Amino acid sequence: MGFAVVRTNREFVRPSAATPPSSGELLELSIIDRVVGLRHLVRSLHIFSAAAPSGGDAKPSPARVIKEALGKALVDYYPFAGRFVDGGGGPGSARVECTGEGAWFVEAAAGCSLDDVNGLDHPLMIPEDDLLPDAAPGVHPLDLPLMMQVTEFSCGGFVVGLISVHTMADGLGAGQFINAVGDYARGLDRPRVSPVWAREAIPSPPKLPPGPPPELKMFQLRHVTADLSLDSINKAKSAYFAATGHRCSTFDVAIAKTWQARTRALRLPEPTSRVNLCFFANTRHLMAGAAAWPAPAAGGNGGNGFYGNCFYPVSVVAESGAVEAADVAGVVGMIREAKARLPADFARWAVADFREDPYELSFTYDSLFVSDWTRLGFLEADYGWGPPSHVIPFAYYPFMAVAIIGAPPVPKTGARIMTQCVEDDHLPAFKEEIKAFDK
């Protein structure tokens, strides 16, 4: 049975008041922002149940509330209302032109309730593309920092579909912006966290001569979504504490199990074959004291409102046999060791003490890339109807084995693993390995 979604209005939402820069001013991006691989679209759905608006007062439709709040937030976050422009060096020389043309906003209505589509839990009963904004006229999607669609359901619930360009903001920065929209939607006079541009504060070490562009082999990767129970996660945490005397996070456990399950499923012929894990660690706390870096403030994320890209790729390399044979606590240990190296590795990168650029990644089938969506602020965003029941990211690419750690829909607990990381030959074994974690 199909459920129709009808788009009822499309427009560019401009800042609702004058913004600081003069029209056409160009803002420089940081060396991390300008990593060519970040010039891509990040797509996600944010599902809000039919709970009554907080405060008890009758309110207009969610789409109208959010559209008005977006216009206010774009005054503070005016670069989101601009456009990316490339210099002579292509995407690697991009800047933001503060045109004030606005963010693309689409209003839509679904001819069903959220219950009719199982709360948009996995698997989706409405195609994701119906709930994400369609293309804006006259502008390339990769030049437009933000697109948003609000789809209202017959029950009063709604879905916010977001498409943003990673060049503007990392996950924490995007979450900070979305929470600012929520602050205005709930009637606040200003966002709880004031935005800071400060891209010049990010280290800019001399780049190595660029090598040839990476060869991107396309894989036939399959989607797998699985939930890890809170009980199983806590057991793994306890086992790690018993073995080491140290604590670990839910993220540590979830990626350890996912990496181990995938490695076992690959059945590499030699136990000495190398397998790789990569995740992206926030480095705002490592910027404290750097020139031009703003001091932390209450309610900030370690950078007093900095919303640009401020992360470092953390890599774990091990022999496949070691990953397969270890218990989950042992794999967690490998991950924790890599995390412990982060301050030193980031400091070396900042002063150009490296032989290979850590931001130039290699995409091979023996490499797994992991992203954590539980700590970005999206699960706390509130437009006046309470926080979302769950968030569904779509950060998948055919050349890149990916696992995203999220949260299952409330009231479920534990962790949700959303992956596109194995081909058909390895799919059954991967599913069985993931399932075995909860036995």
From Swiss-Prot:
EC number in record: 2.3.1.-
Record flagged with keyword Transferase: yes
Superkingdom of origin: Eukaryota
Cysteines engaged in disulfide bonds, as pairs: none
GO BP terms, alphabetized: lignin biosynthetic process
GO molecular function: hydroxycinnamoyltransferase activity
Top-level enzyme category: transferase
Keyword Acyltransferase applies: yes
Residues at the catalytic site: 166 (proton acceptor), 382 (proton acceptor)
Keyword tags: Acyltransferase, Lignin biosynthesis, Transferase
Family matches, as InterPro entries: CAT-like_dom_sf (IPR023213), Plant_acyltransferase (IPR050898)
Pfam families (alphabetical): Transferase
Function: Grass-specific monolignol p-coumaroyl transferase involved in the biosynthesis of acylated monolignols or monolignol conjugates that serve as monomer precursors of lignin. Can synthesize sinapyl p-coumarate, p-coumaryl p-coumarate, sinapyl caffeate and p-coumaryl caffeate in vitro.
Protein family (similarity comment): Belongs to the plant acyltransferase family.
PANTHER family tied to this protein: ACYL TRANSFERASE 4
Name under which the protein is recorded: Acyl transferase 4
Gene: AT4
